[in-house]
Amino acid sequence: MSDSKHVTYEDAGVDTAEGGRAVDAIKQMVKDTNRPEVIGGIGGFGGLFSAAALKDMEDPILISGTDGVGTKLVLAQIMDRHETVGQDLVAMCVNDILASGAEPLFFLDYVAIGHIEAEHMAKIIKGVADGCKLAGCALVGGEMAEHPGVMAPADYDLAGFTVGVVDRPKMLDPANVRPGDVILGLPSTGVHSNGYSLVRKVIGVDGIKPGTPEAAAKAEELSRPLEELGGASLADTLLAPTRIYVKPILELLRAGANVHAIAHITGGGITENLNRALADDVDAVVIRNGAEMGWDVPPVITYVSRQAELAPNEACKTFNMGVGLCLIVAPEDEAAVTEALVALGEKPFRVGECVEGSGKVVYSDEC
């Protein structure tokens, strides 16, 4: 290439100095998530975590999980609100491994972004660190990848990875679920992190670029209080972070509660997640009467479902319908588990019951 000229990495769009500033900005946040097992700090080629404590378990099983936040990030970017999407990221991973009864030990994050700005990155990672503290796991490492020419400067995507542990004799197993078992639910904060491809179409943000006058106008519109949401705004309710259920559930299990299985209600809603916690010969019958569930559904889910004109079955396989986590227990244990959850500050409610079947979710208004 005779016409070539000297080109630096910075000329290509990668600002390594700003990347260094970003690392400096998050060091204390990361350190604040440390557990005693963490060895060293960030900056090495790998995160170090001592496994010595696992020797106290009869048969320790490591359980891993990975996930992202999905297109909820589009809304966060349009609103220029980045402080809580990190909690969403942690929640999506740790709640998944919690379904096996596992304690999350450590977490790693990956941020792909068009252009790194230290202050912007600090907001994102603060949410990750806050989520790790809520889950009791250590943020032992991560990656900030600048993608100039591939992503717009303000665009970013998140991915997370967690590893946890459970003692094999205490591992939750859907095979233990029996006809007659009761399904309890714990409330969600709203939409959590699934269904946003539909949400984006309903609220009209598709095609809007962050940082533009269009984005500013849409952000102002979404920040207005709505009567249908009890005076809250779409921005606040749709960006409410995903709940992290780890601490109350682990405390419940460590106290000896007899829980047969747990389902984290994410993409696919109740219909396509509760079935993952069922034995092959058991169906779940979920309480529903037409468009009304057997418990209070967050107004934002009702609002979006109505705006999209979703039929009840479609809503139930798109959104969590106000149920972030389901616990399946024997009928004789329902009262004790409910009482224990209330003592832990939770507000459990009955979602349905288990009957003989083939491992599927059905609704009481269809039976």
Please place each PLM-identified region on the residue numbering.
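Glycine-/charge-enriched secondary-structure boundary and capping motifs
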Residues: 2-11, 120, 124-138, 151-158, ...
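N-terminal amphipathic/basic leader segments beginning at the initiator methionine
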Residues: 2-37
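Hydrophobic alpha-helical scaffolding
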Residues: 12, 16, 80, 189-192, ...
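Residue-level signature of catalytic and energy-coupling elements of molecular machines
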Residues: 15, 67, 180, 264, ...
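Hydrophobic face of alpha-helices
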Residues: 23, 122-125, 196
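Buried hydrophobic packing segments
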Residues: 26, 48, 93-94, 199-202, ...
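Glycine-rich phosphate/pyrophosphate-binding loop regions near the starts of catalytic domains
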Residues: 28-189, 285
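Short, acidic (Asp/Glu-rich) active-site segment that either coordinates a divalent metal cofactor
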Residues: 66, 157, 170-230, 234, ...
